[in-house]
């Protein structure tokens, strides 16, 4: 099974949907063509169970189940559509009385992101899958370009200055600044070191540029209740960014004349999403 490292590697070959690395034993008769997530249909049973949050103990695992190597605490699954394009479906939380709003928040924050970052923002849409509400977005990696999260690089992941220097060396300073401003405007509390990073050439691991901006489901204050708005200024003291210490201050520090002009052009902005 996959409950131990040896079993996980034997079944998955340590393949992920982020890159093209994989491993096999010296005498194992298996090829990339057989285990590649980019070339093979996904296991629909495992996909459905991962999305529904059901345990996989006792289930016969499949080599082509990208859910087994996908990070994140929210229930999610990958699906390939008829045209071959791969999408991630991500559910909201449940349990609390104000739970489950994360897909709505991700879609709304995505609209803001599209205005600020354009094609450098991954688009999200609201859908239902297996009877449950979810956000849906396209995969942005392929067999040529992979994704490496910033957590893999030896820098201070919470320091705006360190991150700015890092991305500037890749020619992506403006994109990083726009991401920070977006997170400030949408109160994104989850821009941790796994939720932004670098596109690399899979064959050489050469860094190309900052990856497009994604993962917005904890933007837009999904857990704020109606009563909180009566003292929202005080309530906001409970919230802060992962990069920097204060949403307003870090947004101001990241601002440029170019970004300011974009925001001024959004003065009449309205969400097209209506639920």
Regions found by a protein language model. Give the residues of each.
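Phosphate/dinucleotide-binding and metal-coordinating scaffold of catalytic cores
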Residues: 1-181, 185-187, 199-275
């Amino acid at each position: 099974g996959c409950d131990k490292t040896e079993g996980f590697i034997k079944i998955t070959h340590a393949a992920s949907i982020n890159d093209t690395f994989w491993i096999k034993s010296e005498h194992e008769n298996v090829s990339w063509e057989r285990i590649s997530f980019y070339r093979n249909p996904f296991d629909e049973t495992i996909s459905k169970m991962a999305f529904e949050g059901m345990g996989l103990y006792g289930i016969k695992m499949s080599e082509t189940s990208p859910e087994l190597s996908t990070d994140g605490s929210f229930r999610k699954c990958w699906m390939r559509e008829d045209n071959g394009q791969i999408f991630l479906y991500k559910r909201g939380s449940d349990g609390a009385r104000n739970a489950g709003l994360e897909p709505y928040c991700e879609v709304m924050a995505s609209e803001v992101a599209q205005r600020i970052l354009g094609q450098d923002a991954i688009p999200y849409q609201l859908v239902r899958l297996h009877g449950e509400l979810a956000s849906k977005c396209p995969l942005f990696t392929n067999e040529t370009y992979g994704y490496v999260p910033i957590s893999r690089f030896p820098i201070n992941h919470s320091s705006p200055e360190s991150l700015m220097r890092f991305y500037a060396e890749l020619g992506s300073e403006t994109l990083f600044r726009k991401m920070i401003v977006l997170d400030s405007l949408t109160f994104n509390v989850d821009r941790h070191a796994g939720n932004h990073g670098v596109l690399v050439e899979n064959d050489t691991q050469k860094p190309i540029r900052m990856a497009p901006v994604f993962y917005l489901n904890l933007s837009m204050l999904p857990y704020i209740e109606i009563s909180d708005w009566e003292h929202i200024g005080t309530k906001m003291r409970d919230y802060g960014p992962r990069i920097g210490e204060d949403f307003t201050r870090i947004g101001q520090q990241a601002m440029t004349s170019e970004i300011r002009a974009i925001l001024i052009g959004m003065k009449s902005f309205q969400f097209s999403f209506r639920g």
